[in-house]
Amino acid sequence: RDLLLSQLCFLASVALLLWSLSSLREQKELDLMDLIGEDRKWMVGRKLMQVNDTLTSEDAGLRSSKNCTEPALHEFPRDIFSNEDRRQGAVVLHVLCAMYMFYALAIVCDDFFVPSLEKICERLHLSEDVAGATFMAAGSSAPELFTSVIGVFITKGDVGVGTIVGSAVFNILCIIGVCGLFAGQVVALSSWCLLRDSIYYTLSVVALIVFIYDEKVSWWESLVLVLMYLIYIIIMKYNACIHQCFERRTKGAGNMVNGLANNAEIDDSSNCDATVVLLKKANFHRKASVIMVDELLSAYPHQLSFSEAGLRIMITSHFPPKTRLSMASRMLINERQRLINSRAYTNGESEVAIKIPIKHTVENGTGPSSAPDRGVNGTRRDDIVAEADNETENENEDENNENDEEEDEDDDEGPYTPFDPPSGKLETVKWAFTWPLSFVLYFTVPNCNKPHWEKWFMVTFASSTLWIAAFSYMMVWMVTIIGYTLGIPDVIMGITFLAAGTSVPDCMASLIVARQGMGDMAVSNSIGSNVFDILIGLGLPWALQTLAVDYGSYIRLNSRGLIYSVGLLLASVFVTVFGVHLNKWQLDKKLGCGCLFLYGVFLCFSIMTEFNVFTFVNLPMCGD
């Protein structure tokens, strides 16, 4: 914590120094412009000044009489290609540059920005729910946030709002559709996570519709959006308590999760044990030699100790796959040791032990064994325990070796290094394609995943934030040029091209998670990130503009068609939840095809609305 505070102070002092230098430079430029203006007044005659004033007023009248929307292209630096050159084919270079910026944003966010946020959460001792609702949401939605900031403070148009709305619909319909279509299995979904995020997300979209209905946003409306996200963080803080209340109301107080109280007789017994299997090769072939562990534990519930309950919790989908695998291995070892330490065994050739202490019976109908020191086929109990201990030690060594190998593989994963080309043709092509990006990031952003750079996570956070801002600026600039060249409004480019480009990495990550059977995580992440996009991605830049930069001002929306797009966004939430409910809370190909079809309908309707097909909502873009 002390290291975190010191690094924060260092970054604050650097930011203050840069701000002071920038203010001093702007003041000098203003003084220089005043001197140049005074010299021109002395040099130019009064008649010429009157002519200039007349021209200025006429030009202002012409500008006010224009029945078109000023393009956002003029807010960026001048392009090296003319509009005619771009129409002749130079726009392809801008498309390639925009796609490269999409890839660069994905690399910076996944390999540098998110790991630094994880380190910050560890130092601040934040719970998993709060960290996921704050820092992790900011990490996955950083491109959309910076695009919105650029849309408010630079382009002063609707590209930021269009990107947020388009990305939100993409996250709900397209990501769920792709996961259902290509997951390769039917994934079960739980109702709690989906309903929790969907309900609050619906409230957020309703608030957005109310605030942008008059095509302007005031300071208090933007502040309400930010405060709604603070309430969402509080809800995530007490998510476990709210979930328990939800479970009690839906399933009743008698049904507990994970089989902790499924059998009252076993809970009341002081000498209780479970039926377990010895994970060795059985001598018979009619039945499977190994029973599934989760089926076995659910079929024969027993009173859990503290360590056993902890292991059961840590094999759920709330933990990383590596942790779940390690805890599942420990559960198998514990069950095996308990079998060997049990007091009765069958005297058959099979090594499956079945014992229910409450009834004091065994499989062949006899009572408990009178010779507790003897095991299966007369083998001494001490010998069995010694053999089990040796096998347990060997399994522990194998598990440690596997964990070491996994850690080595994790260390190898990460961004490409510019001076270490990988093996393989495909990997070499990827390395050559990303070489300029990896070269720049290698010398400017420390990789806090490496042990020797772990203490520099705040520097990683600051430098990666600057690179995300720079890449987002380049991305919006290129997309604005593409839209101006092709005659496409900025809001359509935001809903389609920018939204898909910034959300494709999240789509790929959700697909990987869904293929592992964790569809809950994929769906909840896609909907939960939309809450951050709406409330912080739009609310925070609007609040900064109307409260800090220009107090009391309004955020003007150029396109009246955005209200229809946001209305479709609200409808997509209802349709998705209703479709999941009709599909019996399962994510499969049928649900995936339906979501992708609805996403296509949304794109068609939004594009036709912005082009004034149904009604007049948008002025045409001004030419050169």
Swiss-Prot record:
Pfam families in the record: Na_Ca_ex
Signal peptide bounds: 1-25
Segments of skewed composition (Acidic residues): 386-414
Tissue: Abundant in the brain. Expressed at low levels in the aorta, uterus and intestine.
Keywords in alphabetical order: Antiport, Calcium, Calcium transport, Cell membrane, Glycoprotein, Ion transport, Membrane, Phosphoprotein, Potassium, Potassium transport, Repeat, Signal, Sodium, Sodium transport, Symport, Transmembrane, Transmembrane helix, Transport
Residue intervals annotated with topology Cytoplasmic: 110-133, 185-191, 237-465, 513-530, 583-596
Subcellular location: Cell membrane
Stretches the record annotates as Disordered: 386-421
Transmembrane parts of this sequence: 89-109, 134-154, 164-184, 192-212, 216-236, 466-486, 492-512, 531-551, 562-582, 597-617
Gene3D superfamilies given in the database record: NCX, central ion-binding region
Keyword Nucleotide-binding part of the UniProt annotation: no
Modified residues (Phosphoserine): S289
Listed InterPro entries: K/Na/Ca-exchanger, NaCa_Exmemb, NCX_ion-bd_dom_sf
Single GO cellular component term: cell periphery
Predominant location category: membrane
Membrane topology, from the record: Multi-pass membrane protein
Residue numbers on the Extracellular membrane side: 26-88, 155-163, 213-215, 487-491, 552-561, 618-624
GO biological process, any: intracellular calcium ion homeostasis
A GO molecular-function descriptor: calcium, potassium:sodium antiporter activity
Sugar attachment sites: N52, N67
Reaction(s) this enzyme catalyzes, per UniProt: Ca(2+)(out) + K(+)(out) + 4 Na(+)(in) = Ca(2+)(in) + K(+)(in) + 4 Na(+)(out)
Alpha- repeat copies, ranges: 130-170, 499-530
Protein family per UniProt: Belongs to the Ca(2+):cation antiporter (CaCA) (TC 2.A.19) family. SLC24A subfamily.
Functional note: Calcium, potassium:sodium antiporter that transports 1 Ca(2+) and 1 K(+) in exchange for 4 Na(+).
Protein name as catalogued: Sodium/potassium/calcium exchanger 3
Organism, as annotated: Rattus norvegicus
